[in-house]
Amino acid sequence: ADVPGNYPLDTRGYSYYCTILGENEFCKKICKVHGVSYGYCYNSGCWCEYLEAKDVSVWNAAKNYCKNPVGK
């Protein structure tokens, strides 16, 4: 079964480049920043399972998940 997800985007609007395909600690950390618990490297970019469109941009994810009130 295909799991839904998205490629998250960094502060410049680019996907996160990765070189170690599959299980990838860097991508897992990135996906956590974007509010989901799991991701991996697919096709040279971090892919996050269950990442919703509203959290694809790191700016949106930060607004949605960071507890720091600055900028709200």
UniProtKB/Swiss-Prot annotation:
Keyword vocabulary terms for this entry: Disulfide bond, Ion channel impairing toxin, Neurotoxin, Secreted, Toxin, Voltage-gated sodium channel impairing toxin
Q: Does the keyword Translocase apply?
A: no
The subcellular location is: Secreted
Q: Which SUPFAM superfamilies match?
A: Scorpion toxin-like (SSF57095)
Tell me the InterPro entries matching this sequence.
LCN-type_CS_alpha_beta_dom (IPR044062), Scorpion_toxin-like_sf (IPR036574), Scorpion_toxinL/defensin (IPR002061)
Q: Tissue expression, per UniProt?
A: Expressed by the venom gland.
Q: Which residues form the LCN-type CS-alpha/beta domain?
A: 4-67
Disulfide bridge map: 18-41, 27-46, 31-48
| Gene Ontology, cellular component aspect | extracellular region
Checking Pfam families in the record gives: Toxin_3
| GO MF annotation terms | sodium channel inhibitor activity; toxin activity
The entry's family comment says: Belongs to the long (3 C-C) scorpion toxin superfamily. Sodium channel inhibitor family. Beta subfamily.
Function recorded in the entry = Binds to sodium channels (Nav) and affects the channel activation process.
Q: What is known of its domains?
A: Has the structural arrangement of an alpha-helix connected to antiparallel beta-sheets by disulfide bonds (CS-alpha/beta).
Q: What is the protein's name according to its record?
A: Toxin Acra II-3
Q: Which organism is it from?
A: Androctonus crassicauda
The upper taxonomy is: Eukaryota, Metazoa, Ecdysozoa, Arthropoda, Chelicerata
